[in-house]
C-alpha cells in the first residue's frame, strides 16, 4: 500500500539530526524507526512506515544468521535448545511446502506498536547472542505447526493468525513448539490450608506457574486471622498480611518466562477477620511491611453481605480456624451456617456492613484494587457446581474465568481471541460464515492445547484434563460498528452484537 501522506525527507532529516559520530548502522536503523513512530500522532501513516522499517530490521537480523527459510529457523531453534523434537519432526519432511506457504506480505497487517511488542517479547531469541531467529511470519507458522497434527491443519491455522483473524493467548504464543510448552493462560488456586506446610507449598506452585507464563488467581480465605491461637506453639498468628507480603515478593521475583512481570490476584471473603487489613494492602501510606504493591486484590462477596449492606445491619467477622466450613458453602447453606455461628458467639468482631462496604469502595476508587466479585451468583450460574461438593472459590487474575477449585485440583483456562474486525465480505457486510469457520478452528486448537500442554504442577494437569475448559473471546466489536457506520448504542449495533 502506498503511504502517500508520508514525507520521507522529513523522517530522513530528523534521523540525520539525531546521529552522532561513530553511530552504527543498527543505531541508524533504530533511530529512523523511532523517528517515524514519533510522527504517528500527526499522521497515522507514519506508524505504518515505522512498522515497515522495523520489519526490514527483523528480516536483516534473521538473515544475518544464515536463516533464509522457515525450516531453517526451526532447525536453528532446535540446535540451540529452544524448539522441541515434535515440531522438528513435522517441519523437516514438509519443509518445501511450509516454506512456500509463508507470506511475508502479511506483515502489512501490523501497526508499529504491535510489531515492536512482537519483536521485543515474543520472537524466539538465540540464548547467547539474544538476536531473534525468526521473522513475524515464521513465528506464526511455528505456532501453527506446533498446535497442529498435520500440514493442512497447520496452514489453515497459520493463515488465520497471520491475517490477524484469530490469535491464541500470550503463553501459547510464547511457548508453542518450545521445549517447555506451557500454553495455558490462567491458573486458579484454592486457598492454602491453614498450615505452614500448605502455605509454603502454595508459594512453590505459584512460582512454578508464573515461571512458565501463567497468570495467577489465589484465595487466602482458609488461612487463620490475626490473633488466632497456634496450638503447637501456644502463640498467636500474625494473620494473612505477612503471608501476602511474602507472596508479593515472590510474584515480583519470578517473572513470566522473562517476557513480562509476574502477576497474581488474591481473593478474600468479607467475613474473614483480616478483611480490613486486606483492603489496606495497596494503600500508598502506612507501614510498608504491611503493603503489597505487586499483588492485585479482589473481594469474594456472598449475597448475605450485600443484604446486610442494604438493611444497614451489622456484619460479623470470623477466624477461619473457628469456622472452616464457611469457605466451601454458598447460597442458603452459607447463610444458615453464618447465622448459626453468629448465634453461637463465634464472631471475632462485629462492624456495620455499610462501613466495610464503604472501605471496599474507597480502596477500589483510590487504588483500582479490591475488585467486587460475587460468590453466590458465580456458583449458582456454573454448570460445574451442579455436581455435589464442587465449589467456585475465586476467579482468575483478570476476573473473566470461573471454575471450581480444591486442594487437589487447580483450575486452568486456555484462551484465544477472535478479531471481529477481520471478518468482512468484500462488499463491506459482516461475514458470519467466515466467523463460524474461525470459531470452529479456534475451538479445536484450544482443545488441543489441553493435550499438548506442559504442566508445571500436577494439580493443574489434573484439573485441565478433567474439565477441558476453553475460553474463546472476541475483540474489535467497536471496529465493526465503525466500519458499518453504526452508532455504538443503537438498535442495529445491539442486534448485531447479540
Language-model features, listed with the residues they occupy:
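Extended catalytic cores of very large enzyme megasubunits
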Residues: 1-498
Amino acid at each position: 500500500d502506498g503511504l502517500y501522506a508520508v514525507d520521507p525527507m522529513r523522517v530522513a532529516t530528523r534521523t540525520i539530526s539525531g546521529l552522532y559520530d561513530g553511530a552504527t548502522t543498527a543505531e541508524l536503523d533504530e533511530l529512523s524507526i523511532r523517528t517515524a513512530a514519533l510522527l504517528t500522532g500527526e499522521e497515522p501513516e507514519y506508524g505504518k512506515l515505522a512498522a515497515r522499517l522495523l520489519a526490514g530490521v527483523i528480516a536483516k537480523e534473521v538473515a544475518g544468521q544464515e536463516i533464509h527459510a522457515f525450516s531453517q529457523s526451526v532447525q536453528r531453534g532446535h540446535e540451540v535448545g529452544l524448539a522441541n523434537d515434535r515440531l522438528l519432526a513435522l517441519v523437516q519432511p514438509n519443509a518445501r511446502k511450509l516454506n512456500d506457504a509463508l507470506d511475508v506480505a502479511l506483515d502489512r497487517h501490523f501497526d508499529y506498536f504491535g510489531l515492536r511488542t512482537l519483536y521485543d517479547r515474543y520472537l524466539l531469541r538465540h540464548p547467547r547472542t539474544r538476536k531473534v531467529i525468526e521473522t513475524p511470519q515464521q513465528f506464526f507458522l511455528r505456532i501453527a505447526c506446533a498446535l497442529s497434527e498435520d500440514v493442512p491443519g497447520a496452514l489453515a491455522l497459520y493463515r488465520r493468525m497471520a491475517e490477524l483473524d484469530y490469535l491464541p493467548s500470550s503463553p501459547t504464543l510464547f511457548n508453542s513448539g518450545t521445549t517447555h510448552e506451557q500454553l495455558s493462560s490462567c491458573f486458579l488456586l484454592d486457598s492454602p490450608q491453614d498450615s505452614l506446610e500448605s502455605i509454603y507449598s502454595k508459594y512453590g506452585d505459584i512460582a512454578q506457574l508464573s515461571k512458565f507464563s501463567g497468570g495467577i488467581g489465589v484465595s487466602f480465605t482458609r488461612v487463620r486471622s490475626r490473633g488466632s491461637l497456634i496450638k503447637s506453639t501456644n502463640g498467636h498468628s500474625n494473620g494473612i498480611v505477612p503471608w501476602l507480603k511474602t507472596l508479593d515478593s515472590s510474584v515480583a521475583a519470578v517473572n513470566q518466562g522473562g517476557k513480562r512481570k509476574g502477576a497474581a490476584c488474591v481473593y478474600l471473603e468479607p467475613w474473614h477477620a483480616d478483611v480490613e487489613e486486606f483492603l489496606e494492602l495497596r494503600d500508598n501510606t502506612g507501614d510498608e511491611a504491611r503493603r503489597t504493591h505487586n499483588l492485585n486484590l479482589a473481594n469474594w462477596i456472598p449475597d448475605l453481605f450485600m443484604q446486610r449492606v442494604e438493611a444497614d445491619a451489622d456484619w460479623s467477622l470470623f477466624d477461619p480456624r473457628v469456622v472452616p466450613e464457611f469457605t466451601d458453602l454458598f447460597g442458603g447453606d452459607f447463610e444458615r451456617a453464618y447465622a448459626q455461628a453468629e448465634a453461637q458467639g463465634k464472631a471475632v468482631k462485629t462492624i456495620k456492613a455499610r462501613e466495610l462496604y464503604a472501605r471496599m469502595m474507597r480502596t477500589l476508587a483510590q487504588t483500582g484494587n479490591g475488585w467486587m466479585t460475587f460468590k453466590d451468583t458465580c456458583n449458582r450460574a456454573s454448570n460445574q457446581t451442579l455436581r455435589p461438593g464442587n465449589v467456585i472459590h475465586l476467579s482468575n487474575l483478570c476476573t473473566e474465568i470461573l471454575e471450581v477449585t480444591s486442594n487437589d485440583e487447580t483450575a486452568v483456562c486456555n484462551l484465544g481471541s477472535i478479531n471481529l474486525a477481520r471478518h468482512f465480505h468484500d462488499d463491506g457486510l459482516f461475514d458470519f460464515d467466515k466467523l463460524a469457520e474461525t470459531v470452529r478452528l479456534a475451538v479445536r486448537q484450544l482443545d488441543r492445547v489441553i493435550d499438548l500442554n506442559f504442566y508445571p504442577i500436577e494439580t493443574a494437569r489434573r484439573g485441565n484434563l478433567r474439565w477441558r475448559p476453553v475460553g474463546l473471546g472476541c475483540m474489535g466489536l467497536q471496529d465493526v460498528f465503525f466500519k458499518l457506520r453504526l452508532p455504538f448504542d443503537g438498535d442495529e449495533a445491539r442486534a448485531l452484537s447479540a
